[in-house]
Amino acid sequence: MSDLSTLKLFATQPHPCSYLDKQEATTLFVDPEARVDKTLYTQLSQLGFRRSGAHLYRPQCLRCQACVSCRIPVNLFKPTRNQRRCWQKNQDLTLHLVSTIKTPEHYQLYTRYIEERHRDGDMFPPSEDQYNAFLTSEWNLTQYIELRHDGQLIGLSVCDQLGDGLSAVYTFYDPREESRSLGKFAILAQIEKARGLGLDYLYLGYWIKECDKMSYKIQYRPLDLLVNRRWMRLN
């Protein structure tokens, strides 16, 4: 295991921001040679790092602080009326934990989602290599939660189990099921899963107020925000 105090970090050159137009971003990466276990991953998550494939990263932008790490304290979470309706609407779904998503069924769902929902993003066009590199890791901490309706796969959530919570990595779903609000349901399901495991938090990544794709996270209350290296609770 690598030690947090001796961990090497590498910063990228400034590059166009993926979330905000006309902004430059700098990303801080953990040494890809570091041996990551649950303890180190938890410590890094508490410092605002996220996983993308086998890489752990955090924004380190010189002129912008728009990306704010956030997490839900699951035992204090109180759903809104809209969130309760979403939960009830999807009670006809079954959730399954699976050990791998390297199957044609999973990849076809991912492809359909990216092609219809994120044609303007850096994950388009989708490829199988990019899919595996983005969602899987070799740390044995990742869980894959299938959402099925009458046996048909309509959604999948990728999350990592930390020492103090779950980290929601990514969710994709069948765009034809948009009326179900499966992204919202997946967060609610992961909150319940974290509670069931006796964990304290669901890490949601970055809240970005000015970005529609990232601003929705503020709807989950209470919400902890990492501000000036301290977690502050927003009720």
From Swiss-Prot:
Please indicate if the UniProt record lists GTP-binding as a keyword: no
> What Enzyme Commission number(s) does the record list for this chain?
2.3.2.29
Looking at the keywords, is Acyltransferase present?
yes
What molecular functions are annotated in GO for this chain? arginyl-tRNA--protein transferase activity; leucyl-tRNA--protein transferase activity
Instruction: List the InterPro entries hit by this protein, alphabetically.
Output: Acyl_CoA_acyltransferase, Asp_Glu_LeuTrfase, N-end_Aminoacyl_Trfase, N-end_Aminoacyl_Trfase_C, N-end_Aminoacyl_Trfase_N
Q: Which GO terms describe its biological process?
A: ubiquitin-dependent protein catabolic process via the N-end rule pathway
- Localization in the cell: Cytoplasm
Primary subcellular site in the record, as a coarse category = cytoplasm
Going by the record, the broad EC class of this enzyme is: transferase
Which GO terms of the cellular component aspect does the record hold? Answer: cytoplasm
Q: Which reaction does it catalyse?
A: N-terminal L-glutamyl-[protein] + L-leucyl-tRNA(Leu) = N-terminal L-leucyl-L-glutamyl-[protein] + tRNA(Leu) + H(+); N-terminal L-aspartyl-[protein] + L-leucyl-tRNA(Leu) = N-terminal L-leucyl-L-aspartyl-[protein] + tRNA(Leu) + H(+)
Question: Known Pfam families for this protein?
Answer: ATE_C, ATE_N
The entry's family comment says: Belongs to the R-transferase family. Bpt subfamily.
The role this protein plays is:
Functions in the N-end rule pathway of protein degradation where it conjugates Leu from its aminoacyl-tRNA to the N-termini of proteins containing an N-terminal aspartate or glutamate.
UniProt name for this protein: Aspartate/glutamate leucyltransferase
Origin species, per record, is Cellvibrio japonicus (strain Ueda107)
